[in-house]
Amino acid sequence: MVTTNKNIEEKYIRTVDEVTRNELGKEVNINLVFLSKEKIKKINREFRNINSETDVLTFVYGDDDLFAEIYLCEDVIEENAKKFSNTYEKELLMVLIHAALHCSGYDHEYDKTNAKKMFDLQERYYEKYLKKYGMDNV
């Protein structure tokens, strides 16, 4: 169990490792950081020039030995879950898969061809892990 406001089960965190290993064929050292709305907004503004909160930000460093930082905002994830009529756990799973694909080199902001591939992969992984975790009928 990862201790946050929501006490997130480790299986969700392991999903990031599994997706990056599958996509890259190697291990990525990943730090997960849970932030308040204010802090994630500040980082979003500083690094992306976007002055708003977001659910996740991913930063990848290095070429051969990859290291990544994934910043998550539980409050925004919770809001998005309600907005999309989803459970918190399903929304978290989607966000973590999205971040894992960024860690694996996929981008959706600057490359539209890559964006389609990324979102197709995201959906496939999401369906796979929903089934794996018995969440596909919830």
Swiss-Prot record:
Q: What is its EC number?
A: 3.1.-.-
| GO MF term list | metalloendopeptidase activity; RNA endonuclease activity; zinc ion binding
User: Which GO terms are recorded in the biological process aspect for this UniProt protein?
Assistant: rRNA processing
- Membership in a protein family: Belongs to the endoribonuclease YbeY family.
User: Major location, coarse class?
Assistant: cytoplasm
Per UniProt, where does Zn(2+) bind?
Answer: 98, 102, 108
Task: List the cofactors.
Answer: Zn(2+)
Organism this protein belongs to: Thermosipho melanesiensis (strain DSM 12029 / CIP 104789 / BI429)
Q: PANTHER family per the record?
A: ENDORIBONUCLEASE YBEY, CHLOROPLASTIC (PTHR46986:SF1)
Relay the cofactor remark from the entry.
Binds 1 zinc ion.
| Function in brief | Single strand-specific metallo-endoribonuclease involved in late-stage 70S ribosome quality control and in maturation of the 3' terminus of the 16S rRNA.
What UniProt keywords are attached to this protein's entry?
Answer: Cytoplasm, Endonuclease, Hydrolase, Metal-binding, Nuclease, Ribosome biogenesis, rRNA processing, Zinc
User: Which InterPro entries does this chain map to?
Assistant: MetalPrtase_cat_dom_sf_prd, YbeY
Q: What is this protein called?
A: Endoribonuclease YbeY
Tell me which GO cellular component terms the UniProt record holds. Answer: cytoplasm
